[in-house]
Amino acid sequence: MARYTGPICRLCRREGMKLYLKGERCFTEHCAFDKRPYAPGDHGRQRGKLSQYGTQLRAKQVMRVIYGIPERQFEHYFEKALGMSGDTRENLVRLVESRVDNIVYRLGFAISRRQARQLVTHGHFSVNGVKIDIPSYKLRPGDIVEVREKSRSLAAIKHAVESSKDRTQVPWVEVDFDSYRGTFLRLPNLEEVTDLPVDVQAIVEFYSR
């Protein structure tokens, strides 16, 4: 399935919850979901009760949309998580959390994962001193993510840094805004990812049908 390229706010309305896909805008009066908190389309206000399958499908879609991952790639992440030892739910969360675009967002160098993905694709970051332009690149604990020297004057990055200085950092990353550098300290535990508004077990059940 190709990556969605339509209106971003439409995704929040479709899922029936605010997914904070536009960063700061989602906290303002301009948020489309706050204005129209129902699904798009002529019958958007008639959202019925979901079946068990529908609930599982929506959980999968919400997580996939939040992290900006195409369908086939997300399915690949699940298959990999299933084959790893330990809790499949935690494995899945750890796989998507260790993507470089997500860590760029977690560090505060972008105001949203969507913006982080664009910035990574355009080559504005390095990992351990090597330029990286693949958003899905998997980081390992101890990897250092840095804004490249020539990119530190970008308005988008400077704005993100200023906006993030007072933000509480998640405990699995560490950032030094003065040097435009951050470290992926460790893999997060499932219960630490408190801003993921889905039941990951429902996703496991969806793929285990």
From Swiss-Prot:
PROSITE patterns: S4
InterPro entries the record matches: Ribosomal_uS4, Ribosomal_uS4_bac-type, Ribosomal_uS4_N, S4_RNA-bd, S4_RNA-bd_sf
Gene3D superfamilies: Ribosomal Protein S4 Delta 41, Chain A, domain 1 (1.10.1050.10), RNA-binding S4 domain (3.10.290.10)
S4 RNA-binding domain: residues covered: 98-158
Assigned keywords, A-Z: Ribonucleoprotein, Ribosomal protein, RNA-binding, rRNA-binding
Cellular component terms per the entry's GO annotation: small ribosomal subunit
GO molecular function: rRNA binding; structural constituent of ribosome
SMART domains (alphabetical): Ribosomal_S4 (SM01390), S4 (SM00363)
Single GO biological process annotation from the record: ribosomal small subunit biogenesis
Function summary: One of the primary rRNA binding proteins, it binds directly to 16S rRNA where it nucleates assembly of the body of the 30S subunit. With S5 and S12 plays an important role in translational accuracy.
Subunit structure and binding partners: Part of the 30S ribosomal subunit. Contacts protein S5. The interaction surface between S4 and S5 is involved in control of translational fidelity.
Stored PANTHER family: 30S 40S RIBOSOMAL PROTEIN (PTHR11831), SMALL RIBOSOMAL SUBUNIT PROTEIN US4M (PTHR11831:SF4)
Family to which this protein belongs: Belongs to the universal ribosomal protein uS4 family.
Name this protein carries in UniProt: Small ribosomal subunit protein uS4
Organism whose genome encodes this protein: Pseudothermotoga lettingae (strain ATCC BAA-301 / DSM 14385 / NBRC 107922 / TMO)
